[in-house]
């Protein structure tokens, strides 16, 4: 195809994982890629020195949601000025295709795509509840892809092949993994410490990702309890850690949820209660309604329910998780985008 493709969006890991999947697929097909993200968030840490990119641009953009009065006006004005910058960039690099993965980072480049005649905008919505930016711009998109939308041309979620490669069917719970994410989740950490003594008595091993801020407290507490645990704050070996586990306790961000599915790992989800539009709860509810996971809100956490879950038929759930997601999602999405560009 002529020209380069713009990938835009980020701010948080969930958006950035999907951006990375698109970059990898397009790069492997020999297509030039420009990434447009924000200085505020994790975008720069992910892509500043990425050799797969023709260019990486980080704009001083901030979210508009939850702002009021003058703050909201200034944020909107900032987005408009950055959108005009993106328009000039599109002309310079002959940009006709923009892929947005959402998040406040995506706003300027997405609006610029809408304003540019002949530009095709594609949106990937990660969550069961559409983000504010995507709600506003979806009507202008050539196509919107979502794992939670029955009308989406591709319903599978872009997940790294590692999670599929390490997948296995579980029969019995010998190891439980607690995943609070790289930022950690005190709620999950405290719950793990509460159930750890009984897990030890049952002969069940524990893997625990605490997040950086809570690592020393949790590690010290396990030592005081005399329980040997594979406890860590952050790891690049999460697919391998998942593979070692037979059951998981986790937040329900979209990327994490589908990674666990790809690994065929039965999971007890505890959604982050302050997630926008309560999307983590509704992400997990899609699986819960199919009998493919266990789900409790933070305020309803119940040790008895947890132990009932690990003693349930995890073999059946693990087998059914295999067919809940296919490994070629990003390839199928890019095929559709490239095919549309030929029209």
Which role fits each region the language model picked out?
Residues 4, 31-32, 53-54, 114-166:
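Active-site-proximal region of nucleotide-activated glycan assembly enzymes
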Residues 49-54, 84-99, 107-122, 135, ...:
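Glycosyltransferases and closely related glycan-assembly transferases
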Residues 250, 266-277:
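Short hydrophobic beta-strand element within catalytic cores of glycosyltransferases
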